[in-house]
Amino acid sequence: MKKICVVTGSRADYGLLRWVMEDIKNSNKLSLQLIVTGMHLSPEFGYTYQEIEIDQFHIDKKLEILVSSDTPNGVNKSMGLAMISFADAIDELNPDIVLVLGDRFEIFCAVSTAMIACVPVAHLHGGEVTEGAIDESMRHSITKMSQFHFVATEIYRNRVIQLGEHPDYVFDVGSLGIDGLLKLNLLDRDALQEVLDFSLGEKNLLVTFHPVTRDRNSSIQQLDELLAALSMLKDTHLIFTMPNADADGRTHSQMIYQFVESKSNSCAFSSLGQLRYLSCVKHVDGVVGNSS
């Protein structure tokens, strides 16, 4: 059986990878290996590895890589630790293919070590554009280190080919998020309010604002202006999800928590998980922020 090693580092990529992992797990031709790292293993971000275990996936390796700093220097040190950790994990697991999604720095490190170890990489959701963030450079770099590409649209397929990848290995398979929407039984309004321990209003917004990693100085100003605008919506209830583990992420989190403490019509969660997040999307009037 071919060993497919899936790497997940955050609530975001796991929500999309889950159904691919299910199919690999249930295959009689493939064997699932799972490396969990990054924000999944941090209490600050909700220990979301527990959701993976609740979904009955066996975790082969837990790689703790996040240093207690959200400065650019701290992120660089986390990347260094990630490179060392992934080198050992991939050497021990000896997978036939490493399967990754997206553009975060921990995924960049996983793919870098796989490339050096001559392990083929399959990359999901390449060819996309994220203006104002280092994700853009990370994603295209991951593309160049990968051998198989599974993209969401023909536009993204063309972009991956423009980067020099062979068309025979670039597949337009659609968005994985659609699979999740079709397979999940979303919560009704009453059930959602119960699991959130928060009452929805007549008007509701779901808010996520990540650090703008290519413009740190304006990022905090942008969030400050966003919170000021939201504070003017007296008749609107606000549900915040917290930022990623990026440079200045903790500063952004502190600003949001301070805002929520002073507003009875708002709440904040380190992680909602896929079911609660998509259920929120179903029932709110709008989604606000800069999350992709």
Specify the residue positions occupied by each region the protein language model found:
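A nucleotide-sugar donor-handling region in carbohydrate enzymes
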Residues: 7, 41-43, 146-221
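Conserved nucleotide-sugar phosphate-binding/catalytic loop shared by glycosyltransferases and other
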Residues: 31-75
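Short internal beta-strands
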Residues: 33-38, 149, 238-243
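Structural motif
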Residues: 3, 96-97, 204, 286
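A generic structural motif
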Residues: 26-33, 58, 234-238
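Donor-nucleotide binding loops and adjacent catalytic segments primarily
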Residues: 52, 187-283
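Active-site and donor-binding regions of nucleotide-sugar-utilizing enzymes
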Residues: 5-8, 14-25, 65-167
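A donor-sugar binding/catalytic signature common to diverse glycosyltransferases
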Residues: 100-101, 123, 149, 273-292
